[in-house]
C-alpha cells in the first residue's frame, strides 16, 4: 500500500509545490496548442512555431490528444475542440481504412505504412483518455484500437507485444522491443480502467515479468531494449547508430526510470482490482531506479542523466534529454508515495532542481528538449520542442495516486 506517513517534509504534500506544478502544466499546454495541423498535431520549434515542413504524425497526434483530454478532465477550458481534432485525425487520415491500424503519418504526408506496436499503444492511450473526457467518437476509436491490438499485436504465447508488420499485415518484423512493450504496459493500465476488463492488467504483468523481472533482472536491472522475435537479446543492435531516437544502442537510463514507475502503477492497479501481485514488483522498481541513478546521473563530470550506456555501464551518448529527466522525477515521486522513504524525496527535489534550472525555458516557452554533455542547448537528436506528453505528465503524476491511471484518477473514477 502507499506509504504517506513521512517523518520529513515532503514536496508531495506541499500546497505550494502542487500549485507550482499546476502552473507549469498550464504553461506547457498553452505552448502546445499551436501544434494543430489539418491532419492532427505537428512539431513546434524552439519558439512555439510549427517547424518548417511540419506534418502531423500519429505519435504526436495521439500524445497531444491524450494530454488535452487529461487537461479537459482537470477542468481546464479550451481543450475540448483539440481533443475532438485529435480523435478526427486518428479516425481519419492517420488510420488505414483498407487494412486497419494506423500509419506513422497520413499517406498524403508520406507517412510510413508499416504498423508499429509503439504507435498503436499511444492511439490506445489517447482513446482511453478521450473516453474519460466524454468526447464524441472516442468510444469508437477505443473499440477500433482494442480490436487491432488484440488481433494483430498481442501474443498470448509470448505474453508480450509483437513489434511491427507491413501495411497489409502479411510480413512481420523479426524483432521484439522493450520500448513498444513499455508503452503498451502504460496503455494497458488505462484500458483496464476505461473498460473494466482486468485482463489488461494480466497482460501488463506478463510484459513486466518478461522484460523486467526476467531479462533486466538478469542484467543487473539495466533494461535490455532489443531482442529477436524469439526474445534473445541483441546486444549489438544499432551499435553503428547509437543515438537513434527510438532504438538506441545499449541501455537507456530514462527507460529504467519509466519502467520503475510503471511497475508501481501496475502493482497499485492490480491491488485496486483485487488481483494478486508477485512479491518482486516493488523490489524490481527499486533496483531499476537505483541503477539508473548510479550509472546515469552525474557520471561524466557534469550533472544530468546521460541518454545511453554501454554494456559496461559507461556513457555512450552523453546528451541529456528532457524526457529522461521528466521520467526520473516521476519515478522518484512514485517510489516516495509507495515507500515513504526520504531517499526518494531527495532524488525528487534533485531532479526538479535540474529541470527548472536547465530544461524549463521561461523566455521562449515549454522545455528545451536536449542538452549536450556540457549541459548546453543542443538539437543533435531532437530538434525543436515537439513533445508535451513527458513534461505535462511530470506535472500531474506527483499529485495523484499510483492507481487508477492518469485520466481516470483526475476524473475521480473508481
Swiss-Prot record:
Shows high production efficiency and may be suitable for green production of D-mannose. It is an enzyme of class 5 (isomerase). Coiled coil: none annotated. Strongly inhibited by Ag(2+), Cu(2+) and cetyltrimethyl ammonium bromide (CTAB). InterPro entries: 6-hairpin_glycosidase_sf, 6hp_glycosidase-like_sf, AGE/CE. Signal peptide: none annotated. Keywords: Isomerase. The active site is at 255 (proton donor/acceptor), 390 (proton donor/acceptor). Its EC number is 5.3.1.7. GO terms for molecular function: isomerase activity. Optimum temperature is 40 degrees Celsius. Thermostable up to 45 degrees Celsius. Catalyzes the reversible isomerization of D-mannose to D-fructose. Shows high specific activity towards mannose and fructose, and has no detectable activity towards other monosaccharides and disaccharides. Monomer. PANTHER family: N-ACYLGLUCOSAMINE-2-EPIMERASE. This is D-mannose isomerase. It comes from Pseudomonas cannabina pv. alisalensis.
Amino acid at each position: 500500500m502507499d506509504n504517506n506517513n513521512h517523518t520529513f517534509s515532503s514536496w508531495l504534500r506541499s500546497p505550494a509545490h502542487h500549485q507550482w506544478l499546476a502552473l507549469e502544466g498550464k504553461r506547457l499546454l498553452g505552448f502546445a496548442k499551436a501544434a494543430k495541423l489539418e491532419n492532427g498535431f505537428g512539431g513546434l520549434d524552439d519558439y512555439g512555431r510549427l517547424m518548417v515542413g511540419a506534418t502531423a504524425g500519429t505519435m504526436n497526434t495521439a500524445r497531444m490528444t491524450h494530454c488535452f483530454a487529461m487537461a479537459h478532465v482537470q477542468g481546464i477550458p479550451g481543450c475540448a475542440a483539440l481533443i475532438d481534432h485529435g480523435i478526427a485525425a486518428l479516425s481519419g487520415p492517420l488510420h488505414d481504412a483498407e487494412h486497419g491500424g494506423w500509419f506513422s503519418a497520413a499517406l498524403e504526408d508520406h507517412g510510413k505504412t508499416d504498423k508499429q506496436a509503439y504507435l498503436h499503444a499511444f492511439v490506445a492511450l489517447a482513446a482511453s483518455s478521450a473516453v474519460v473526457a466524454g468526447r464524441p467518437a472516442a468510444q469508437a476509436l477505443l473499440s477500433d484500437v482494442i480490436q487491432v491490438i488484440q488481433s494483430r499485436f498481442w501474443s498470448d504465447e509470448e505474453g508480450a507485444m509483437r513489434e511491427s508488420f507491413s501495411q497489409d499485415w502479411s510480413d512481420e518484423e523479426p524483432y521484439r522491443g522493450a520500448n513498444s512493450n513499455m508503452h503498451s504496459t502504460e496503455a494497458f493500465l488505462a484500458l483496464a480502467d476505461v473498460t473494466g476488463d482486468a485482463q489488461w492488467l494480466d497482460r501488463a504483468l506478463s510484459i513486466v515479468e518478461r522484460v523486467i523481472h526476467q531479462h533486466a533482472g538478469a542484467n543487473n536491472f539495466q533494461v535490455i531494449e532489443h531482442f529477436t522475435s524469439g526474445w534473445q537479446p541483441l546486444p549489438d543492435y544499432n551499435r553503428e547508430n547509437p543515438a537513434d531516437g527510438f532504438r538506441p544502442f545499449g541501455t537507456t537510463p530514462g527507460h529504467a526510470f519509466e519502467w520503475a514507475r510503471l511497475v508501481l502503477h501496475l502493482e497499485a492497479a492490480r491491488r485496486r482490482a483485487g488481483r494478486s501481485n508477485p512479491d518482486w514488483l516493488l523490489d524490481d522498481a527499486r533496483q531499476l531506479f537505483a541503477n539508473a541513478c548510479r550509472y546515469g546521473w552525474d557520471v561524466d563530470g557534469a550533472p544530468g542523466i546521460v541518454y545511453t550506456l554501454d554494456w559496461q555501464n559507461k556513457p555512450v551518448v552523453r546528451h541529456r534529454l528532457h524526457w529522461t529527466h521528466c521520467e526520473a522525477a516521476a519515478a522518484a515521486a512514485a517510489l516516495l508515495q509507495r515507500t515513504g522513504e526520504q531517499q526518494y524525496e531527495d532524488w525528487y527535489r534533485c531532479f526538479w532542481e535540474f529541470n527548472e534550472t536547465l530544461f524549463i525555458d521561461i523566455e521562449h516557452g515549454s522545455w528545451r528538449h536536449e542538452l549536450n554533455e556540457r549541459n548546453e542547448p543542443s538539437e543533435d537528436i531532437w530538434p525543436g520542442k515537439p513533445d508535451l506528453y513527458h513534461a505535462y505528465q511530470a506535472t500531474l503524476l506527483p499529485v495523484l495516486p499510483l492507481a487508477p491511471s492518469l485520466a481516470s484518477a483526475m476524473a475521480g473514477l473508481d
